[in-house]
Amino acid sequence: MSERPPEKTLAELASPNHECRACGYVYIPSQGDQKTSVSPGTPFEALPLNWKCPVCGAPRNYFISTGETDAPSGFAENLNYGFGFNRMSGGKKNLLIFGSLFVIFLFFLSLYGMG
């Protein structure tokens, strides 16, 4: 029997962002680059070889992959389960969790002030 290759998550399938090591500029493929007229949806690998960082002018080899930040972290078949939290990216989930904890903390602090 032949083994199936492991299934990739949506974050692994999405085109990764790349960050300039010289200045910190982040190339996001879904936004493209308006300064050098690179259309949205262009992956980093498809950029012209002479493309440079629009902020500091560093060449392409100064960029490192930082992964996709806006993609959901799970598998496609699991996105419809739950209350919609599976469609959120990791950063949005963190904001929701820690924001809720902060609101609960403020609630208990207000109870302390009442008594």
From Swiss-Prot:
Its cofactor is Fe(3+). It comes from the Bacteria. Keywords: Electron transport, Iron, Metal-binding, Transport. GO terms for molecular function: iron ion binding. Pfam families: Rubredoxin (PF00301). Fe cation binds at C20, C23, C53, C56. Residues 15-66 form the Rubredoxin-like domain. Binds 1 Fe(3+) ion per subunit. Gene3D superfamilies: 2.20.28.10. Rubredoxin is a small nonheme, iron protein lacking acid-labile sulfide. Its single Fe, chelated to 4 Cys, functions as an electron acceptor and may also stabilize the conformation of the molecule. Could be involved in hydrogenase-linked redox processes. Belongs to the rubredoxin family. This is Rubredoxin.
